[in-house]
Amino acid sequence: MRHYEIVFIVHPDQSEQVPAMVERYKGMVLGQNGKIHRLEDWGRRQLAYPIQKIHKAHYVMMNIECGKETLEEIEHAFKFNDAVLRHLTIKMDRAVTEASPMMKEEKAKNLLAPQSDAAEPTAAA
């Protein structure tokens, strides 16, 4: 089996449907004896350029290990799902399990936020 990194962008009006979509794609991979090495929900982000007059979209990234047939099935599902605006599949040399730079950036923001929140109450008191 081969390793792939898949990123797909979901229409912002369909953000509530993202967990169900992820479960369906996970089911496709795991149902064919594949593995999911990393699954990250990057949330709603600004697009680099408008797609169908939309400026923000919901991003999801998956690192999977699966066969060619499973990958074709997932890409076929992306093409016929109107909520998926764009998708990109990259073949990887190995399984990637460490956090992506996007998640490291979010974690850094989260680590900074509690410190600033903790500083505000003491200043107000």
From Swiss-Prot:
It holds the Pfam family Ribosomal_S6. CDD domains: bS6. The keyword Endoplasmic reticulum does not apply. InterPro entries: Ribosomal_bS6 (IPR000529), Ribosomal_bS6_sf (IPR035980), Ribosomal_S6_plastid/chlpt (IPR020814), Transl_elong_EF1B/ribsomal_bS6 (IPR014717). Keywords: Ribonucleoprotein, Ribosomal protein, RNA-binding, rRNA-binding. One of its GO terms (biological process) is translation. GO terms for molecular function: small ribosomal subunit rRNA binding; structural constituent of ribosome. Residues 101-125 are annotated as: Disordered. GO terms for cellular component: cytosolic small ribosomal subunit. Binds together with bS18 to 16S ribosomal RNA. HAMAP family: Ribosomal_bS6. Belongs to the bacterial ribosomal protein bS6 family. This is Small ribosomal subunit protein bS6. It comes from Laribacter hongkongensis (strain HLHK9). The lineage of its organism: Bacteria, Pseudomonadati, Pseudomonadota, Betaproteobacteria, Neisseriales. The gene is rpsF.
